[in-house]
């Protein structure tokens, strides 16, 4: 008789088990030793550390925009607010927000199209994707997909914007951490949008973005990893941007 009961976190030596089974006499019990493997992150540890740290944050102002634009920024932020990205998962901005239709409550506002400023449904959603990207730049989360606008924008620095449109281009990042991360977005009474990336800090580095100009209309965005003394111990290139001059509008 061969008896075994395998639970989560246990393993056995298959070769030893086979040898014991083959050498055992008929109708006798055999004992197979199991090894208990302690999980790297227990449920208790996970719950105790869940979303306790602000990994990155960024704020941008929508003040001075049309009522439609401010409405669209707030609506998009409310859709993204509270999104949780599990370890190994990919966050897709378009996958969460979807198409910016009137049925969803979106209004017309200024946006870029074919190198011009025109009225489009959902104008302003790119401020949310750009502010999210800017917050992500203060973390070591992997940026998988990001495209710059055709022309510079006013709400984030050059090289820190992320244009989106249904269904492409998209903005995507991967949670390469051991713990989940949560996206928190808030639009306050002064029309300032704040994006925070909450999670569990897994290293002692401080991460800051740096944009290096190549020429007047192109640049490369880096992340600088700094130790406790403020020394840069590592730099990595995140993306390159190339813009055209702004024709008109804002």
Show where each model-derived region lies.
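Well-ordered beta-sheet/strand-loop patches within structured domains
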Residues: 1-250
């Amino acid at each position: 008789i061969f008896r075994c009961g395998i639970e989560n976190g246990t393993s056995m030596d298959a070769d030893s088990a086979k040898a014991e089974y083959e050498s055992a006499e008929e109708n006798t019990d055999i004992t197979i030793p199991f090894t208990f493997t302690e999980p790297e992150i227990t449920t208790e540890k996970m719950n105790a550390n869940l979303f306790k740290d602000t990994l990155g944050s960024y704020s941008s102002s929508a003040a001075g925009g049309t009522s439609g634009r401010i409405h669209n920024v707030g609506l998009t932020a409310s859709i993204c607010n509270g999104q949780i990205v599990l370890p190994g998962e990919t966050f897709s901005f378009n996958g969460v927000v979807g198409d910016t239709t009137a049925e969803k409550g979106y209004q017309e506002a200024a946006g870029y199209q074919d190198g011009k400023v025109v009225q489009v449904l959902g104008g302003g959603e790119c401020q949310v994707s750009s502010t999210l990207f800017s917050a992500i730049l203060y973390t070591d989360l992997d940026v998988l997909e990001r495209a710059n606008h055709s022309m510079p924008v006013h709400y984030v620095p050059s090289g820190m914007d992320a244009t989106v449109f249904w269904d492409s281009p998209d903005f995507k990042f991967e949670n390469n951490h051991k713990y989940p991360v949560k996206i928190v977005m808030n639009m306050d009474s002064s029309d300032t949008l704040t994006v925070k990336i909450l999670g569990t800090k897994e290293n002692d580095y401080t991460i800051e973005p740096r944009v290096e100009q190549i020429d007047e209309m192109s640049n490369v965005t880096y992340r600088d990893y700094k130790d406790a003394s403020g020394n840069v111990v590592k730099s990595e290139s995140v993306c390159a941007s190339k813009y055209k001059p702004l024709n008109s509008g804002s």
